[in-house]
């Protein structure tokens, strides 16, 4: 049964409301705005019937303070008043009130208004749930599609298998610890999964060369940032996805590539991915070397603070490292 809170300084008016709708709804009858706010601190309701003209705290002030409460910010409100001033009605509706009922109350009008507002509120919540469900489905499909693309790209080299998934995992952990919002973290995850997509344009004999690269070959490798950015530039649904591919090899002191950006010029997503990318490279076996020890990896990370890596994000990453949150890669992975 729906719960309605009726607030009016007139006991007679509260009794009228009770007689009109008793049996249809669970009712709570209170005589002041102060009592209503105190009640909503610990209770939820489906609708508030709020008298506009009350002593000490009128309906307008009660409404404003009600919207500041967790249990009151979304609850529909119908104003009740004997005031015939049309401006009052306009003001209430502009504030976000669901309806406006004038005194003396007409039983059938009151019941219909209440029923209409509750049905509309229920429909709104239903649609919001459906939108959230559909959004979650789309996000799941997006993640799975991006992860599949990433895995297909990395299938060219067994030594980098799973690299982008791990970089995404470490990037998300860092952003969560840094207090990023949920949507920004989800975007970062997608960006990190595709940060190396430009390697699709690098020839195998260069990408998988076991020995030292020539200057010409290294220039080809570096071009994967530009290729990746060009591939991703038309994707508008994930903010900064192009920046992640283009700038994840920039260095904090301005000596990176492809643009030589420094410090805050480098987008935050790229600064985070750059740390996660470097960590996973050191933490993984490569065609030309074994994975490095934890001691060596930590030393290399610290040595890169303020030169290769953003100091703020690196300090957070080192916290995760020291807490054992960053897994050592198994040779079978």
Sequence positions of predicted segments:
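Receiver (REC) domain active-site loop signature in two-component systems and cognate sites
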Residues: 54, 62, 66, 92
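Two-component/phosphorelay signaling modules centered on CheY-like receiver
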Residues: 2, 11-29
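C-terminal output helix
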Residues: 101-114
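Metal-dependent catalytic cores of enzymes that make or break cyclic nucleotides
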Residues: 147-333
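Helix N-cap/capping motif at the beta->alpha junctions
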Residues: 29-38, 59-61
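Active-site beta3 strand of CheY-like receiver
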Residues: 43-50
């Amino acid at each position: 049964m729906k719960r309605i809170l009726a607030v009016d300084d007139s006991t007679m008016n509260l009794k009228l409301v009770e007689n009109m709708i008793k049996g249809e709804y669970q009712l709570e009858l209170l005589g002041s705005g102060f009592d209503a706010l105190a009640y909503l601190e610990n209770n939820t309701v489906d609708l508030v019937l709020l008298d506009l003209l009350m002593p000490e705290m009128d309906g307008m002030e009660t409404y404003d303070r009600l919207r500041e409460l967790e249990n009151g910010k979304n609850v529909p409100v119908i104003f009740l008043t004997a005031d015939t001033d049309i401006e009052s009605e306009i003001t209430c509706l502009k504030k976000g009130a669901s309806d406006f009922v004038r005194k003396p109350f007409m039983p059938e009008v009151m019941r219909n208004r209440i029923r209409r507002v509750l049905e509309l509120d229920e429909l709104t919540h239903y649609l919001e749930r459906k939108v959230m469900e559909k959004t979650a489905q789309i996000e799941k499909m997006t993640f799975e599609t991006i992860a599949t693309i990433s895995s297909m790209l990395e299938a060219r080299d067994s030594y980098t298998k799973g690299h982008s998934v791990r970089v995404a995992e470490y990037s998300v952990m860092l952003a969560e610890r840094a207090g990023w919002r949920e949507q920004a973290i989800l975007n970062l995850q997608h960006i990190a999964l595709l940060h190396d997509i430009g390697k699709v344009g690098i020839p195998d004999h260069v990408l998988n060369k076991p020995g030292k690269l020539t200057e010409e070959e290294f220039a080809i490798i570096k071009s994967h940032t530009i290729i990746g950015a060009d591939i991703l530039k038309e994707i508008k649904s994930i903010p900064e996805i192009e920046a992640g591919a283009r700038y994840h090899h920039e260095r904090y002191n301005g000596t990176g590539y492809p643009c030589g950006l420094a410090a805050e010029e480098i987008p935050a997503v790229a600064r985070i991915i750059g740390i996660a990318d470097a960590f996973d490279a050191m933490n993984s076996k490569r065609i030309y070397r074994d994975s490095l020890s934890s001691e060596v990896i930590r030393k290399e990370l610290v040595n890169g603070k303020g030169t290769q890596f953003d100091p703020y994000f690196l300090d957070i990453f080192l916290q995760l490292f020291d807490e054992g949150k960053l897994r050592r890669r198994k040779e079978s992975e």
